[in-house]
Amino acid sequence: MNVHQVLSGAGPVDAVTTQALAFRELFGAWGWGGRDVAASIDPRVGDRVKPLRALAAAGGDVLLIHYSAYAPKLRGVLELPQRKLLLSHNITPARWFWDHDPQAAVQCALGRRQLPEFAAAVDVAAGVSLYNARELGGDTVIPILFDPAALGPARAADPPPGPPLVLFVGRLTPHKRQDEVIRAFELYRRRHAPDARLVLVGSPLNDRYRAALQGLADELAPGAVRIESGLSREQLAERYRCAHAFLCLSEHEGFCIPLLEAFHFGVPVVARAVGGVPEVA
């Protein structure tokens, strides 16, 4: 049996790409073949994900479409005769981006508008969480594949002694509300732990948004907040091992893989119960 995976885009630190590659390993263990293709590819994953034009599916093959972004180039896949499964990873509502990145807002708006068309054209439409599945009008869930071993060993004891370290991991974007994380941290620091530190780990929406977060941090908690991007897997694991708490105040999440990572490292989690977050716990 062959299962071909189709993505709108593929990159080395993209959660959807990570999931697709995890599925490929699982399919291989089951003796299933197939190819992974994407409409756009970061060269760093070019050895594992091929251009969309490389898709060559036979009659009995299955196409697994990972839906996470506006993907007009994937419309042609819907016309193929093979059986098709759509897996929705969720697209953030555009309202969160208009004031910060209008182009991203347009892409999100188009992606959410296109989703029903794709869902209606496949044999099965599912979500990576019940929250996502219900956006499709159903309740079929294909769970996130999570391999704790890939993160490295959990810490053997409590975090190292020293000032409390609060951690956030995830994209630095408006809907994830790092601004509220900074404000909550400042309140905690002022009332309970003047020497506490906050580390925000993730790639920013753009330089302007990163600067806005840094400006807020410098205003409310000068010298106590650090923003980090582009960490290696080992560096990220070390941030988790040193953390005293993980704080997530996102207002839109289809799932939230960093919560699973925090659980793996034994870090206490405080998270706003929205979207797919309650399903993680």
Residue ranges, per PLM feature:
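Membrane-proximal helix-turn-helix segments that form the acceptor-binding/catalytic region
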Residues: 92, 104-124
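Short alpha-helical donor nucleotide-sugar binding micro-motif in glycosyltransferases
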Residues: 238-243
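Glycosyltransferase donor-sugar binding loop
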Residues: 39-42, 197-211
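Nucleotide-activated donor-binding/catalytic signature segment of Leloir-type glycosyltransferases, i.e.
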Residues: 202, 210-237
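Aromatic "clamp/platform" in nucleotide-sugar-dependent glycosyltransferases that forms part
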Residues: 251
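Carbohydrate-associated surface elements
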Residues: 131, 145
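Conserved donor-binding/catalytic core segment of Leloir-type glycosyltransferases
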Residues: 126, 157-176, 182-185, 199
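Short hydrophobic beta-strand element within catalytic cores of glycosyltransferases
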Residues: 268-271
